[in-house]
Amino acid sequence: MALGGMTTRALLLGVSIVSMGALVSETALAQAAAQAGDVQPQKPKPAKKKRAAAKPAAVPAQVANANAQASRSGQSLDEITVTASKTQERAIDALAPVSVVTQEQIQLQQPSRLSQLFYNVPGVWMQDRGDDPSTAINIRGLQDFGRVAVVVDGARQNYQRSGHNANGSFFLDPELIGGIDITRGPTANIYGSGAIGGVASFRTKDINDVLRPGERWGVDMSGSYGSNNNRGLGSVFGGVRVDPTVDVFGGAVYRTQGNYKDGAGTEIGNTGNDIAAGLMKVTVRPADGHEVKFGGLFQDYSYTIGQLNRGPTTTPALIALNQGSSVYASNAKNYTGTVTWKYARPEDMLFDFNVSLYGNRVDNDQTKTYHYSTAGTALCGAGSAGNNISGCVGDQRGYLLDTFGVDVNNTSRFNIGEWRNAVTYGFDVFNDKVKTFDSRGNSNITTPSGERTVSGGFVQLKTNYSSWLEVIGALRYDHYELNSSGTAVGVNNVSSSGDRLSPKITLGVTPVAGFTPYVSYAEGYRAPSISETLIAGGHASGGGPTFVTCADGTAGLFCFLPNPNLRAEVGKNKEVGINLKYNDVFTSGDSFRAKFNFFRNDVDDYIDLVASTPVLVNYVFMGRPGTILNSNFYQYQNIANAKIEGFEAETAYDAGLWFLGVGATVQSGKNTQTNVGLATIQPRKVTTTGGVRLLDRKLTISAQWASVAANTDLPAGYVPSTSYDLVNLYVAYQPTQDITLNFGVDNILNQYYRPYAIPGSTSDGTTQNDALWTAPGPGIVYKGGIKVHFGGA
């Protein structure tokens, strides 16, 4: 499935050339400046300023400038966001639990993984395996199978591979990111189908992230190095404004690291990886108010997943303690292409639209390099090892997902007296095609091939009266169709479909300036995934005895059963929130921002994997009879309702020379049928961030302390997460306008921490040591970096 390394190098070279192409000659720049002088009188700058003041739908450059001002003030809640209502508003003004991660924060923290960026964001966690560079995002205890809508430059990220890992992840290197918007809960239901947990919207870097005001071209070159173990990064991003109607931007990233040690000093095997990535964007403004952007993003991840045995495995006790897993040399390629057309003019109250077309491909090829025992010669041949679950050493398997989608929306505005009204309406469609290949293993059963189309349309009325009342009402229609196309093992043209209307209503008042309480009710709709619906066939025995023969003739430990009758999950979220926004609180120029939320999300028809009632099974293995109490069938079913409730707080005070912020989450989640806690809940997280700005703000020193409680209310057989206190230190120094030096220490206390619960064993009783051993985060990491800017007019 994957393309060769030559393609990777060629693409990265091309992107690098384009990004460095910003360093054009002085003659070309002079010509472009002359052309700009001819064009500018036709589109004077005062009109742009008027547009920004006239309505929130500002052009992207103005939004970037507004966000830059917010970043300089230290208030991420002053950033512009669109995820909650598809209309531009500052995060602090949104009547929704919205958080923003800025490029300034990313630059300060120098993260090697996305999870490092979300400690101070309430309600958000990441489930990382140390030997897998992809990321699974969890919002308010919901994750997997699309419960959180993840978009990169507007393109849905729906990749999913079932195994000893999260059922849904995505690939994105932090160095590529220009900003992140997070909306928690289904309050952003108009943003897209499936988001009963929330929306995570990632924006990759663009020309306004590199070029400064007045520059026609610019380049940022960055490099960093970290300990534990040889964490290296190099990147270059550059762009040129060819003329006032055309921008060209590109960049390339290379990252590498070796196996890290956890806080206990244990080296975590196969946690090293190599990542190469490149992006390209061309922006054209063919007419006043119109902007068309063509974007391309490519990422190449080379890594090894799986764990070697850590000791002898001669007895059941030693197997439980020391047995690893199969190991696979992995190469994942992620291709994303987008075309976006935006239009907005201040005098046009009828049209303010966005049209987005996108395609996303994840192509993950794996070759088995190690088996945890020497057994399997009957299946694999002399000198080889393996079993019929994971195949034999040297076998290949692959996971391919193609997603294509379109997202169209428009906002029309009208005023009636003191009532200011904005009607936003549109539709979105995406299609997933999954193709799984496994030469002798079980992956094509556990992650079946298939196709799914999900579509929806919405209308929203956002109305404001005077300066003290805001009401938002919305209605979304969702529809899905899913089929196996005859490709799933043991399934012949299984299909399912469904649809639903989901409402949203929000009411907010501002009785006094700066104080805005609000209440909200919103529903979200998540269609069943391909794997949940189509999984079918026998779970191979791994060389041991077989207990049951399935309908398709395969035999194994048990049979997976498809379920075309699965109903979609429906999230029903109740929210009470307060936004606080004050300036000049204690001293002139200081600012205080805060968002508080109380919520309860009732998820109806929650989908989970259910085992049949155990029965006695007689079997014969190697000529010896035996009897076992076995669950012969497993199937995804609508067996429970989930109730998740909690409190979130995000506060930030900035006095200019110093700043302090606290992000907190306290929540609980239950399967209401069994009254057992959900394994994906993180009960408590409090993160305090503070710092000072010295030397005329050239030097910033910041510390972050995350205090996290363990999740112990779990289904039977789960290994709890650990409680921990993670302390990080960051320093940024700008000796000149064009040079920025960064230093940091992650996990300065060198704590051992395992941030999420995992199953203690699989359904067949074998260990999940590969997941357990790779769950701990790195121990102490020292790191430093430099960014150099070049640019000119």
Placement of each model-derived feature along the sequence:
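Acidic, small-polar-rich N-terminal luminal/periplasmic segments of exported/outer-membrane proteins
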Residues: 42-212, 576
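Outer-membrane beta-barrel translocator/receptor signature
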Residues: 159-164, 175-179, 184, 189-265, ...
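Membrane-embedded beta-barrel scaffold of Gram-negative outer-membrane proteins
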Residues: 223, 250, 352-370, 510, ...
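Transmembrane beta-barrel wall of Gram-negative outer-membrane proteins
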Residues: 225-256, 266-306, 331-342, 417, ...
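Outer-membrane beta-barrel domain signature, strongest for Gram-negative TonB-dependent receptors
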Residues: 273-423, 427, 590-592
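Structural signature of Gram-negative outer-membrane beta-barrels, strongest in the C-terminal barrel
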Residues: 285-287, 420-422, 428, 448-601, ...
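Gram-negative outer-membrane beta-barrel transporters
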Residues: 430, 465-467, 471, 586-604, ...
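C-terminal beta-signal and adjacent terminal beta-strands/loops
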Residues: 523-526, 532, 604, 609, ...
